[in-house]
C-alpha cells in the first residue's frame, strides 16, 4: 500500500515542494521501502523432486506443506476458451496439495504447447497429461503402488509348492 501511495504522489507531482524546499525524495524513499516490504513478504516456495526415493517434497518458507510419491506431481496442458469460441492452451505444473504453477501462458498453438509440455515432463521425469481426461497423448512415467495396470511390471503369482507339484518338476 505504501508503494502505491508513494507512486501516486510522485506521478501526480504531489509533495514536490513544501515551503520552498524540495521534498520529492520522501515519496521516492517511501516507494523504495514499500517495494522492499512487498517483495520480502512473498513467502518462498520450494518443490523438491527426489527421483532416487520416488518422492516429492513441497515447502513454504521452510515449513513442509506436503510430501508424497512422484505419481502425484505432473505437467498438464490446460484448455481455456473465450466468449468467441477461441481455444487457448497453457502448461501448468500440478500435484496433490500443490498450488498450480502456470509454466507457459495462454497460446493458440496446441502442437507447440504439447511438444513443450512433453519435453518439460521428460526432463523433470514426471508425468504429462493432455487437456482431455482420457487421451492417448498422456505420458505416464510413475504409477501408484498397487496399480492394477502398470506397464513393464509383471505381478508375481503367489504359488505355494506342494509335494505333488515338486514331483511334477522331476525329469
Swiss-Prot record:
Auxiliary component of the CatSper complex, a complex involved in sperm cell hyperactivation. It comes from Mus musculus (Mouse). Signal peptide: none annotated. The gene is Tmem249. Keywords: Cell membrane, Cell projection, Cilium, Flagellum, Membrane, Transmembrane, Transmembrane helix. Residues 18-28 are extracellular. It holds the Pfam family TMEM249. It is found in: Cell projection, Cilium, Flagellum membrane. Residues 1-2, 41-171 are cytoplasmic. The chain crosses the membrane at residues 3-17, 29-40. This is Cation channel sperm-associated auxiliary subunit TMEM249. Component of the CatSper complex or CatSpermasome composed of the core pore-forming members CATSPER1, CATSPER2, CATSPER3 and CATSPER4 as well as auxiliary members CATSPERB, CATSPERG2, CATSPERD, CATSPERE, CATSPERZ, C2CD6/CATSPERT, SLCO6C1, TMEM249, TMEM262 and EFCAB9. HSPA1 may be an additional auxiliary complex member. The core complex members CATSPER1, CATSPER2, CATSPER3 and CATSPER4 form a heterotetrameric channel. It is a multi-pass membrane protein. One of its GO terms (cellular component) is sperm principal piece.
Amino acid at each position: 500500500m505504501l508503494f502505491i501511495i508513494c507512486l501516486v504522489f510522485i506521478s501526480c507531482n504531489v509533495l514536490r515542494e513544501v515551503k520552498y524546499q524540495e521534498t520529492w525524495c520522501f515519496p521516492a524513499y517511501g516507494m523504495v521501502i514499500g517495494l522492499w516490504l512487498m517483495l520480502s513478504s512473498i513467502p518462498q516456495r520450494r518443490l523438491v523432486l527426489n527421483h532416487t526415493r520416488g518422492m516429492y517434497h513441497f515447502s513454504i518458507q521452510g515449513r513442509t506443506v506436503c510430501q508424497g510419491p512422484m505419481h502425484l506431481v505432473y505437467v498438464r496442458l490446460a484448455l481455456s476458451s473465450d466468449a468467441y469460441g477461441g481455444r487457448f492452451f497453457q502448461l501448468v505444473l500440478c500435484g496433490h496439495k500443490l498450488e498450480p504453477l502456470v509454466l507457459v501462458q495462454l497460446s493458440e498453438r496446441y502442437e507447440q504447447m504439447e511438444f513443450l509440455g512433453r519435453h518439460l515432463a521428460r526432463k523433470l521425469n514426471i508425468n504429462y497429461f493432455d487437456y482431455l481426461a482420457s487421451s492417448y497423448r498422456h505420458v505416464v512415467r510413475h504409477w501408484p503402488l498397487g496399480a492394477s495396470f502398470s506397464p513393464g511390471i509383471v505381478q508375481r503369482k503367489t504359488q505355494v509348492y506342494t509335494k505333488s507339484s515338486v514331483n511334477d518338476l522331476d525329469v
